[in-house]
């Protein structure tokens, strides 16, 4: 029995060691290969968008959908084109809720009777009182502040039937032994891309923006996996 418990504990320790951080002991975090985040696969969600006939540009026209102006570079509109995403997030939110509830109830009864007979006199009385008092108070406050200013290049990975573009971009910066990773993805309209091939983040539909990283500082800030497991299953 003791050998079995020891084997289970050893297997758990080995499972905890088989992660990327264990393989990077003594060296800086490895960067992802170029183009690793550009694999585009058809997803069922794309079926939600209606199919529309592709716009055909007249051969005699001087303008087309890709051209922003006569003397400007063409805008990104095809798979493989590159555009710049301008991320300027400066959000602040404050919520404060207060609840106060009170109820008081009181009731009373008084009964009495008396009588006289030839043999004896009798009298009785009774009092009954009851009351209740309940009170509930609640106070909650939430404050949030986020500020992020970044520019990241993204690649057009797909074109929907209605002409909207699927974009995906990532940026990795390694300073000493800490790797910062920025990912952005979403759906944009070609008309929202300006003449400099720049689009603001608030014009990206289904935007997915993540800014994080991994490295020595991140490992220290995160609790060990054993502690996370205990916190997950502990009822207290």
Swiss-Prot record:
GO terms for molecular function: cytoskeletal motor activity. Residues 96-143 are annotated as: Disordered. The basal body constitutes a major portion of the flagellar organelle and consists of four rings (L,P,S, and M) mounted on a central rod. GO terms for biological process: bacterial-type flagellum-dependent cell motility. Keywords: Bacterial flagellum, Cell outer membrane, Lipoprotein, Membrane, Palmitate, Signal. It comes from Sinorhizobium medicae (strain WSM419). One of its GO terms (cellular component) is bacterial-type flagellum basal body, distal rod, L ring. Residues 1-16 form the signal peptide. It comes from the Bacteria. This is Flagellar L-ring protein.
